[in-house]
Regions:
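Conserved glycine-rich
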Residues: 196-198
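Short alpha-helical segment of the dimerization/phosphotransfer core of two-component systems
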Residues: 40-45
């Protein structure tokens, strides 16, 4: 858990030290770059704190998860809107394949949007070049299936089994490339299960990952 906070704090400290350097302070472009770094790491820490609180409340059954009939395609569109700026910054694309004819489920709009945003952010984050993401929906019996597919780094079989654990990190052999999903995917799993659904991942190293969510439709 400490790693989730130590890394951004260390980055912020390094950036502050760099800005204090007399040679750097006169270079507006570099100062702006370091300030952006501080801003990004601060946001990252804030997100981790939010996730800690969410998981804690979930475990104590204190999180308000009131559910209402909702059109899943609307939730997906909302989640995509949330990540659009990050995606545009990386010149990435999201291609939608909405094949589900029945799409109304009993969900908590806020938490289910967070679930999809989390998976989309990971898809963008772990795409080494320009992110190319695909979102699919389909109906299987009385369920809706949502698939979010990326063409990024992919993950090992071990990582696929453990990726929904709190603070699981996959060591790739490169000290500078330790992939951490933090609390995000643990939160995803708890929320999906609270919606009587399932979430799992299919992945291959170097070929990308597909996160699959199944939740029941309203009959």
């Amino acid at each position: 858990m400490t790693h989730e906070f130590k890394t951004p704090i260390a980055t912020i400290n390094l950036a502050l030290d760099a800005i204090r350097n007399p040679k750097i302070i006169e270079d507006k472009e570099k100062v702006y770059r370091y300030l952006q770094m501080i801003r990004d790491e601060n946001k990252r820490m804030h997100a981790q704190v939010e996730n800690v609180l969410r998981i804690s409340k979930l475990e104590k059954k204190e999180l308000d998860i009131t559910k209402e009939p909702t059109v899943i395609h609307d939730i997906i569109e909302d989640a995509i809107e949330h990540v659009n700026l990050i995606l545009e910054d990386k010149q990435g694309t999201i291609v939608k394949h909405y094949n589900a004819a029945r799409t109304t489920c009993l969900v908590n709009e806020v938490h289910f949007t967070n679930v999809l945003v989390n998976i989309l952010e990971n898809a963008i984050k772990y795409s080494p070049d320009v992110p190319e993401i695909e979102v699919f929906t389909e109906n299987i019996k009385d369920m809706i299936l949502i698939k979010i597919k990326d063409h990024g780094l992919g993950m090992s079989k071990v990582a696929q089994k453990r990726v929904f654990e709190k603070f699981y990190r996959e060591h790739t052999g490169d000290l500078h490339n330790v992939k951490g999903h933090g609390l995000g995917l643990a939160y995803v799993k708890r929320i999906v299960e609270d919606h009587n659904g399932q979430v799992y991942v299919e992945s291959e190293k170097g070929k990308g990952s597909t996160f699959i969510i199944k939740i029941p439709l309203i009959n």
